[in-house]
Curated annotation (Swiss-Prot):
Pfam families: Lectin_C (PF00059). Residues 54-65 have a biased composition (Pro residues). Belongs to the SFTPA family. Keywords: Calcium, Collagen, Disulfide bond, Extracellular matrix, Gaseous exchange, Glycoprotein, Lectin, Metal-binding, Secreted, Signal, Surface film. In presence of calcium ions, it binds to surfactant phospholipids and contributes to lower the surface tension at the air-liquid interface in the alveoli of the mammalian lung and is essential for normal respiration. Enhances the expression of MYO18A/SP-R210 on alveolar macrophages. Glycans are attached at N207. The gene is SFTPA1. This is Pulmonary surfactant-associated protein A. SMART domains: CLECT.
């Protein structure tokens, strides 16, 4: 049967004059699909791939074991800045009396000699009418006649201040120096904000006065005080020239 089909085909080809290779004819003919074969054996492992990016951090794990013992103290750091000063504390109890001072005979002798020399000097100056001691005060003058500010400055340089009487006895002592030099003298007083109110140079109110009748009457224009030769006071401008008398 197969042989007859092949023979018939060849005859038809020869008649039509067409050349055909048996191999090409067979390639063009589609056959019936065969039955699928059995699966092959597994292939070999492939090569390692490229390293991937890091993944996100995982969740916190459960607590570990018991905490360990405290470590040793560290090194002491540098001191911090000083804090604000606190409030003043309450005074403490008075302590017991201390031992008596050791009497230094040589020192006592030196002090006695100095005291004696001072008394001699004061006596000599008092005879010249340039210094007088009254109670715990010493009044002294160099005989210069200058304005109020110059007197204040010269007395301060000498360690004193402008003389001002605070009692009748002190007023008389200063008046004797004024009389000796036959000129008026400024006193250590200044007028305050209110006209007619005078104060000591440290700002304290006056506790002794010896005003001339009707004084003071400068009405705020005469800020200083002068002493007359009779010991009475008068308010006066601070720019006048008066005898410089200091107290120590």
């Amino acid at each position: 049967m197969l042989l007859c089909s092949l023979t018939l085909t060849l005859i038809l080809l020869a008649v039509s004059g067409t050349k055909c290779d048996v191999k090409e004819f067979c390639a063009a003919c589609s056959g019936v699909p065969g039955i699928p074969g059995s699966p092959g054996l597994p292939g070999r492992d492939g090569r390692d791939g490229v390293k991937g990016d890091p993944g996100p951090p995982g969740p916190i794990g459960p607590p570990g074991g018991m905490p360990g013992s405290p470590g040793h103290d560290g090194l002491i750091g540098p001191p911090g800045p000083p804090g604000e000063r606190g409030d003043k504390g309450e005074p403490g109890e008075r302590g017991p009396p201390g031992p008596p001072a050791y009497p230094d005979e040589e020192l006592q002798t030196t002090l006695h000699d100095i005291r004696h020399q001072i008394l001699q000097l004061m006596g000599a100056l008092s005879l010249q009418g340039s210094m007088l001691a009254v109670g715990e005060k010493v009044f002294s003058t160099n005989g210069q006649v200058v304005d109020f500010d110059a007197i204040r400055e010269s007395c301060a340089r000498a360690g004193g201040r402008i003389a001002v009487p605070k009692s009748l006895e002190e007023n008389a002592a200063i008046a004797s120096l004024v009389t000796k030099h036959n000129t008026y003298a400024y006193l250590g007083l200044e007028e305050g904000p209110t006209a007619g109110d005078f104060y000591y140079l440290d700002g304290a109110p006056v506790n002794y006065t010896n005003w001339y009748p009707g004084e003071p009457r400068g009405r705020g224009k005469e800020k200083c005080v002068e002493m007359y030769t009779d010991g009475q006071w008068n308010d006066r401008s601070c720019l006048q020239y008066r005898l410089a008398i200091c107290e120590f």
